[in-house]
């Protein structure tokens, strides 16, 4: 029997899973994995609820959102995969001495498919003394 594993989105921080799949590590341990991509990041949790997938990866924010949307939701998070804040900023120019405070008043775009990167950055900004609303 195979386990259907669904990724919610393609991310660099999930590289160990991609490597394990490509190198046959699951099969070497006797685990058959059918790997799928979710149509959208938000639909991964719903695949668990409707039984179309056995397990998916994603963050706790996705589970909390699903709890708000689906009465009686019983999803649980387990097996931490990514520790700390795995997201990164990409700038137009090199900034060797970059500080989060440099973002104040700057035009900024965040990923829109998932809420977690912006939520993490907002907290980082607040800790650096920058109001998230000061970014354009």
Predicted segments, located by residue:
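Short, glycine-/small- and polar/acidic-enriched structural segments
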Residues: 1-136
């Amino acid at each position: 029997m195979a386990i259907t594993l669904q990724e919610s989105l393609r991310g660099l921080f999930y590289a160990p899973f991609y490597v394990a799949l490509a190198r046959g590590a699951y099969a070497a341990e006797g685990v058959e994995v059918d790997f799928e991509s979710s149509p959208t990041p938000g639909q991964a949790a719903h695949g668990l609820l409707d039984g179309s997938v056995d397990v998916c990866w994603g963050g706790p924010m996705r589970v909390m959102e699903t709890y708000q949307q689906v009465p009686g939701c019983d999803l649980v998070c387990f097996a931490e995969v990514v520790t700390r804040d795995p997201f990164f900023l990409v700038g137009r120019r090199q900034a060797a001495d970059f500080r989060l405070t440099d973002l104040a008043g700057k035009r900024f775009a965040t990923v829109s498919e998932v809420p977690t990167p912006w939520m993490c950055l907002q907290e980082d900004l607040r800790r650096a003394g920058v109001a998230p609303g000061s970014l354009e």
